[in-house]
């Protein structure tokens, strides 16, 4: 009953709390050579003051983008600010969805493009030059969900001089655990008409192709242009797995 009461109070507070401004904007990325979108939440009163604000970069999950699924975050932020739980801050949600497998894993890839460099060298500079941020690592955080949680952890560790905080929600932090997906991958493949690995076999298959596009792309291997780290018997291909390991957050932290 207590949990229901608290949840009801949050709903009521969300309805009556001061509202920030949510915008979807685009800018040209020199790294990716295309116009890139992002959703930004500016705190209530942003246009009426000269105040500078901390910034949180929130990275979306696999199969999502900057405007789907996570819209409720803005209401939660407004509520927390209204009740004094947090100070006002800016939240930026960049779009790193990409074809053909729906997610870049915030990684530089010959197949997808250099999305790590896009975040680090293009997006942050654009946001700091366009909005009244506090351009200091102690006032810049990075977080995300699922694939975004992985990306936030990896980028936060690699570029600790840029970020003062890292938060990961359901992100893959240790790649050794990814081998637990192999039975599901093989099960999905068993239902394939040809008994072959295909991204259309199921979600785990799509995820494995997506991750392979980030960590082990092979532009000389049509039609999928990736090297999967698993063979037809469900055994790990060590030479491909070794290409994944430099992107393992645990390994990055240890280095």
Protein language model features and the residues they cover:
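Sec-dependent N-terminal signal peptides
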Residues: 3-18
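Non-catalytic cap/lid and distal C-terminal segments of serine-dependent acyl enzymes
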Residues: 19-255
């Amino acid at each position: 009953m207590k949990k229901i009461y608290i949840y009801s109070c949050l709903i009521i507070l969300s309805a009556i709390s001061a509202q920030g401004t949510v915008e979807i904007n685009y800018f040209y990325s020199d790294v990716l050579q295309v116009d890139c979108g992002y959703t930004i939440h500016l705190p209530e009163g942003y246009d009426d003051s000269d105040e500078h604000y901390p910034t949180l970069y929130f990275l979306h999950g696999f199969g999502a983008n900057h405007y789907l699924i996570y819209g409720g975050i803005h209401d939660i932020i407004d509520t927390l600010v209204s009740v004094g739980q947090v100070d006002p801050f800016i939240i930026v949600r960049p779009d790193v969805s990409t074809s053909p497998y729906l997610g870049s894993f915030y990684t530089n890839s010959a197949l997808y493009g250099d999305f790590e460099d896009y975040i680090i060298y293009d997006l942050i500079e654009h946001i700091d030059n366009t909005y009244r941020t506090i351009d200091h690592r102690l006032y810049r955080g990075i977080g995300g969900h699922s694939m975004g949680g992985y990306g936030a952890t990896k980028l936060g560790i690699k570029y600790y001089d840029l970020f003062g905080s890292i938060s990961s929600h359901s992100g893959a932090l240790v790649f050794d655990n990814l081998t637990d997906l192999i039975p599901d991958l093989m099960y999905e493949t068993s239902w394939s008409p040809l008994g072959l690995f295909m991204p259309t076999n199921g979600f785990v298959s799509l995820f494995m192709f997506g991750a392979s596009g980030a960590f082990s792309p092979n532009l000389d291997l049509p039609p999928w242009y990736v090297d999967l780290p698993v063979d037809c018997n469900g055994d790990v291909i060590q030479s491909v797995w070794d290409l994944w390991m430099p992107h393992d957050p645990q390994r990055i932290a240890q280095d």
